[in-house]
């Protein structure tokens, strides 16, 4: 049996995964709503100073607060999300979204009343 080697395995993974990434939709301002990984994605644009202050106080760290070139608001390496805290407790990281891995820092009425699987992505649009 032929050995694949690291390069062969990486090439195989690329061939298998590329069609999924290429066909995956991404949340946009124009689209307004996106469905990704079994969850509904929407976006919101609010002042994040209180959200960031609470996160810094709770985590004892001061992650970089920044806005990506595509307008997505970030906390360190994570996309800032409003979610259902019963599904994703406050501070949960690595929540998959079409715009990258997120962190649960906010919530809203939508998360308890209309769609428990919805994530609201913080943006500057």
Task: Identify the role of each PLM range.
Residues 20-125:
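Solvent-exposed, well-ordered loop and adjacent helix/strand elements within mature globular domains
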């Amino acid at each position: 049996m032929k050995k694949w080697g690291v390069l062969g395995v990486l090439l195989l993974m690329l061939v298998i995964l590329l069609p999924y990434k290429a066909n995956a939709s991404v949340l946009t301002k124009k689209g307004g709503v996106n469905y990704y990984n079994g969850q509904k994605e929407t976006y919101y644009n609010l002042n994040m100073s209180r959200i960031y202050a609470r996160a810094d106080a709770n985590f004892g760290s001061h992650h970089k607060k920044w806005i990506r070139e595509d307008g997505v608001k970030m906390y360190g390496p994570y996309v800032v999300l409003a979610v259902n805290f019963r599904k994703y407790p406050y501070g949960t990281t690595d929540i998959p979204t079409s715009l990258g891995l997120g962190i649960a820092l906010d919530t809203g009425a939508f998360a308890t009343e209309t769609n428990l699987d919805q994530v609201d992505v913080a943006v500057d649009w």
